[in-house]
Curated annotation (Swiss-Prot):
UniProt xrefs under CDD domains: Ribosomal_S15p_S13e (cd00353)
Protein's UniProt name: Small ribosomal subunit protein uS15
Gene3D superfamilies the record matches: 6.10.250.3130, S15/NS1, RNA-binding (1.10.287.10)
Gene name for this UniProt entry: rpsO
Record organism: Variovorax paradoxus (strain S110)
GO cellular component: cytosolic small ribosomal subunit
Family per similarity comment: Belongs to the universal ribosomal protein uS15 family.
Length: 88
């Protein structure tokens, strides 16, 4: 789990309004933070298959949110992936 202070910072950086916690941008940013925190764990614990399943679930959920955002507003989608560095 990510620390509350890091989570609050991620929400503040990606929120569209003052108390925005549910927009796709915030959800994708939080999932990205959790994924980035878990990724090094699997470099040292390669046989943690149950944990890997959770990671793949998060990646899949992030992909679905990004697909939704792309279909609704392509400009916000491109800005978000550039900000988070998700695509090359």
């Amino acid at each position: 789990m990510i620390a509350a202070s890091i989570k609050a910072e991620v929400v503040k950086d990606n929120a569209r309004a003052a108390n925005d916690t549910g927009s796709p941008e915030v959800q994708v940013a939080l999932l990205t933070a959790r994924i980035n925190e878990l990724t090094p764990h699997f470099k040292t614990h390669a046989k943690d298959h149950h944990g890997r399943r959770g990671l793949l679930r998060m990646v899949s959920r992030r992909r679905k949110l990004l697909d939704y955002l792309k279909s609704k507003d392509a400009d916000r989608y491109t800005a978000l992936i550039a900000k988070l560095g998700l695509r090359k």
